[in-house]
Amino acid sequence: MEVAGAQAGILPLLLRHPASLRGSLSLSCGGARRSWAAAAATAEGGGGEEGRGYERVPMDTPGAYRLVDRATGRSVIVWGGTDDVSMPSPAVLSTTTRVPDRPKENGRSTSIGNFGRLKAQKVKVLARRSAHLKREDSGRISTSRFSESPSDESDEDGTYFERDRARNTRQNSRSRDDKTRGAHSLNSVLRQYRGADDLDFPGSEATSGSKRWGNISDVTFGRQNQRQKGPLDSGFFSRRSFKEIGCSDEILGALRSFGFPRPSHIQAMAYRPVLEGKSCIIGDQSGSGKTLAYLCPVVQNLRKEEVEGLHRSSPRNPRVVVLTPTAELASQVLNNCRSISKSGVPFRSMVATGGFRQKTQLESLDQELDVLIATPGRFLYLLQEGFVQLNNLRCVVLDEVDILYGEESFEQVLHQLITVAPLTTQYLFVTATLPLDIYNKVVETFPDCELIMGPGVHRTSSRLEEILVDCSGDDNEEKNPETAFSNKKSALVKIIEESPVRKTIIFCNKIETCRKVENALRRVDRKASQIKVLPFHAALDQQQRIANIKEFLNKQTADSMFLVCTDRASRGIDFANVNHVVLFDYPRDPSEYVRRVGRTARGASGNGKAFVFAVGKQVSLARRVMERNIKGHPLHDVPCV
């Protein structure tokens, strides 16, 4: 803004226009106090511009002009109001503000303090106005996509969605009851929270004008805007390069062909200890890259031994054994091995699980072998029958170790393995969740294990939106498993109809419930023209399960696919680009909750939503779990590193 009176050495004075601020200040300028009342009287008594004692000089700033005293040349800038408002009145111009006498510094007047206060007031007014305009702009944007759900609708339609009141972390000191609002009906939420973040499918209701869901973080436990800053906010990738963590040129070339710019946090943390042959417990959240965190350094050691002539591949004598809880996870690890091998790091790998022809697997064992991937039962059979020797064994990997320890026969398998394996064998325990009882069992048997815990262990992804759906029903409704299933089914159908996405995983606790959900979904689309229902549980033979998994992971399909499964699908399987996860039945323990919702929002940039159906006491339990997730707290205590 132009400085008035600069040539005369006069301090510029900024005043609110009298049209908007009555009682403006008249301050001394440059140490000489002079009232503008005489000038104003001259202006009112004079006829026309020529007879005035001062004149108004327009400025470029709208609503501002410079008031110049013709007699002395002194001027003041007046800002505010409109350009065509009349001159300040004599009463305004002659008003003075009494200030306490202050000691002078070097003989100069301290009237600058008045100007300072006026300037501070002006800045505060501008700040308030700016904040108000921002709130109005954000309100216009938000109300165009979100509308506040009326409280009376939730009473009419029944309670379905829990609204999170703890979005602002300043409210953390409030009680738990104060952190959540009243529930909203599924109907009202589906009716009001619409947007374009879900996919459109040819021939689906979404393309024919049906309502769709948008970003509904106002009524969800999504952490994109709510989670407190923590280690997870530093991003998926580590700041270190693959070269810095110890990758060989061969492995580095393979990783570059995969398109990875840098290692993930757990890969950067675990690579060097694994490469040095240390036994380790490796833990981080689902989708963090744990498979490559152990596989790449292990394969690098195999290649180093071959180059140095220390060891070579031999039939029925693997140098690495990987045990997994399910055949599907074993197949996934095998695919990773083959991808590395095809990218310029040659080694031989095979899988041995139940459900396949035993003759084919035995024939594969007769060939040269480096890495054997197996389920515990099949591995124990091959070991006891003499089809596998462990003379050359260098490393044992127990993937999803917490699940393995939950199997009755696993400790027998582990004992047999320890008895036969060489004393120098390296053991790697890999998991997304490590309850303290499992940790204690591991360190009791392997006290020298190095503990490597990534930033996301026992935590869900920060890009996951968790939505609590209360399926308890009305208070006067009879409470039994049948009514609970009916309420859940109604909620699921509404989600399918109102929020069409490409891939959804539905978790149930029992095979019987899976079948009931499958039938309900098929009745929604009797012609099977818009949705594809794929079951995945132990009642199916292994070939059918693998076929369904492959179809679900197919990127070319235009169908909206639903994988209806038990916890078998949550055990380490890497599902890419899953949009929604539905917990139709609430999981039995927090670890299973983490594994289930971890099937979406995976990797460096994955996003997804988890719909958690709960009834009765499960509602408060789910709310507490989600509140911990919002704050970034682990669902289990993390073992001390």
UniProtKB/Swiss-Prot annotation:
SMART domains: DEXDc (SM00487), HELICc (SM00490). Residues 150-159 have a biased composition (Acidic residues). Signal peptide: none annotated. InterPro entries: DEAD/DEAH_box_helicase_dom, Helicase_ATP-bd, Helicase_C-like, P-loop_NTPase, RNA_helicase_DEAD_Q_motif. GO terms for biological process: cellular defense response; cellular response to ethylene stimulus; cellular response to jasmonic acid stimulus; cellular response to salicylic acid stimulus; defense response to fungus. A motif (Q motif) lies at residues 240-268. Induction: In leaves after treatment with defense-related signal chemicals such as benzothiadiazole (BTH), salicylic acid (SA), l-aminocyclopropane-1-carboxylic acid (ethylene-precursor), and jasmonic acid (JA). Also up-regulated during incompatible interaction with the blast fungus Magnaporthe grisea. SUPFAM superfamilies: P-loop containing nucleoside triphosphate hydrolases. Gene3D superfamilies: P-loop containing nucleotide triphosphate hydrolases. The Q motif is unique to and characteristic of the DEAD box family of RNA helicases and controls ATP binding and hydrolysis. Belongs to the DEAD box helicase family. This is DEAD-box ATP-dependent RNA helicase 50. It comes from Oryza sativa subsp. japonica (Rice). The lineage of its organism: Eukaryota, Viridiplantae, Streptophyta, Embryophyta, Tracheophyta.
